[in-house]
Amino acid sequence: ETEIELTINKHKYLAFIIEDIVKVQANYNVAEAYRSAQKEAVLRAIDSDLAGLHASAGTNVAGGATVDDADMLAVVLALDLANVPQSERYGIVGAKVMGDLRAVNRYSVFDQTGKEGLAVSGKGLVTTAYGFELDMSNNVVDDTTNTHNLFFHKSAMSLALQLKPTYKMEDSVDYIGVKSVLHTIYGVAVERSAALVDLERNS
């Protein structure tokens, strides 16, 4: 097997101070509100670093101004030709591509899918297509020319956490409040480029 080198070189965190006067006067749990913001910021950073691996994709599919069914079939073909397993395939797409997929009747209307149409189902996302489990994230890379939407097998990319997201808190006499930080140390890498497809759509 080919040896994969994964460098753990990313340290992401969000820190803040809750002053005692804020904590005392607020009528809600200030620390809990900020903790949610910390989680979102750190997870978004990890998400963005994984999205940045598009440059190492084994195949690029040009979706142009609108992604359609033919583009999706090109993505499927690229993985099939690379002998990528049919199971555990995933797609992470930006809002514009999700909008394009909603407009493809094959994925979204009853007479094509046999399921309640997206327009009336109460579910706004196309969640599956050609064996891919789809999710939407606006953290996909937008280089002002194209957005880079990723389709991949689970073996394509690796995330190694040297320090899982960890909280630290301490009282501060200097600032008369509580210091809080959520941080993590990790690395990301493409492990199997042939199992990663970059579907490009005009920005």
Predicted segment positions?
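Extended, solvent-exposed, turn-rich assembly/linker loops in the middle of proteins
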Residues: 54-124, 128
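Sequence/fold signature of self-assembling virion shell proteins
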Residues: 1-9, 25, 104-203
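Residues at beta-strand starts and edge strands
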Residues: 12, 32, 87, 174-178
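Short amphipathic alpha-helical segments, especially helix-boundary/capping motifs
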Residues: 11-15, 51-53, 153-154
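A short glycine/small-residue-enriched secondary-structure motif
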Residues: 5-21
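Alpha-helical scaffold segments that mediate packing/assembly in large oligomeric complexes
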Residues: 18-86, 198-203
